[in-house]
């Protein structure tokens, strides 16, 4: 028979309340009774809160199954246990986490490009992982697979979405950067968020990993003109120095 993976969720009482509130901001609860109970924090409300936490991952995985983002296939949620496809390596053993493998510089760059591309494709459908790191990425024979999505947030409805996106990308930068230091200063999160805010982010949008530190949109033309002006001035200065030496 086919071997599958069973994910058993932690009890709601072991989860940080502050974190739960941040992640659940913007999530819609159709049942008004459940929504009121969750706001009051009653026993029933906590049960409903836990249920929405579980179903959020199923919903996120379902949405991503229709994209090019590699995630495990789901096989149902039963009493707080999520059955999923078991991700394996080339030899059929459980695939290691990104955190558990050593990489050459080239391998680190390839994995980084793939993961950032997944992050971009998630943002294209309005989703931010919210807790992405080397511990939530498996690596099978075909490359990275994204896992652990109960906290995934709606990019347009959650006020913390940009902060979470930046943190997600920074975590991947920091880990892959141990093997390829040039990745440490990658600014893809800021770049893709700016494009997303302008409705100009698409699945095939190329990212260069560079973006201004501030949150305002830079006038690229003006910046280029200023750089060219400085270079021209420096060239003239060098020419004057050469002429005076002659």
Stretch-by-stretch model annotation:
Residues 1-94, 124:
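Conserved ATP-binding subdomain of kinase catalytic cores across diverse folds
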Residues 136-148:
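Conserved protein kinase catalytic/activation segment
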Residues 124-134, 139:
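Catalytic-loop of the protein kinase fold
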Residues 106, 114, 121, 145, ...:
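Regulatory N- and C-terminal appendages and interdomain linkers associated
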Residues 10, 16-33, 94-96, 106-110, ...:
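Active-site Asp-x-Gly
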Residues 80-82, 136-139, 189-197:
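A glycine-rich phosphate-binding loop feature that marks nucleotide/adenosyl-phosphate handling sites
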Residues 92, 100-124:
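An alpha-helical support segment within catalytic cores of ATP-dependent transferases
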């Amino acid at each position: 028979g086919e071997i599958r993976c069973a994910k058993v969720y932690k009890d709601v009482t072991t989860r940080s309340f502050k974190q739960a509130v941040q992640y659940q901001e913007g999530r819609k609860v159709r049942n008004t009774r459940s929504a009121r109970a969750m706001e009051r924090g009653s026993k029933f409300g906590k049960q409903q809160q836990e249920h929405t936490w579980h179903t959020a991952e199923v919903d996120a995985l379902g949405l991503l199954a229709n994209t090019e983002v590699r995630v495990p296939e789901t096989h149902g949620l039963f009493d707080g246990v999520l059955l999923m496809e078991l991700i394996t390596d080339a030899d059929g053993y459980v695939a290691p986490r990104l955190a558990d493998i050593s990489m050459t510089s080239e391998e680190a760059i390839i994995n980084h490009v793939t993961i950032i591309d997944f992050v971009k494709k998630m943002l294209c459908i309005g989703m931010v992982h919210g807790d992405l790191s080397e511990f939530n990425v498996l690596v099978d024979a075909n490359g990275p697979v994204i896992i652990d999505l109960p906290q995934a947030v709606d990019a347009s409805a959650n006020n913390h979405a940009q902060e979470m996106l930046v943190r997600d990308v920074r975590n991947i930068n920091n880990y892959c950067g141990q093997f390829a230091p040039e990745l440490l200063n990658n600014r893809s999160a800021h770049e893709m968020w700016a494009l997303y805010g302008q409705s100009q982010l698409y699945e095939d949008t190329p990212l260069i990993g560079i973006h201004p530190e501030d949150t305002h949109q830079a006038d690229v033309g003006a910046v280029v003109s200023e750089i060219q002006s400085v270079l021209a001035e420096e060239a003239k200065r060098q020419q004057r120095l050469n002429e005076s030496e002659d």
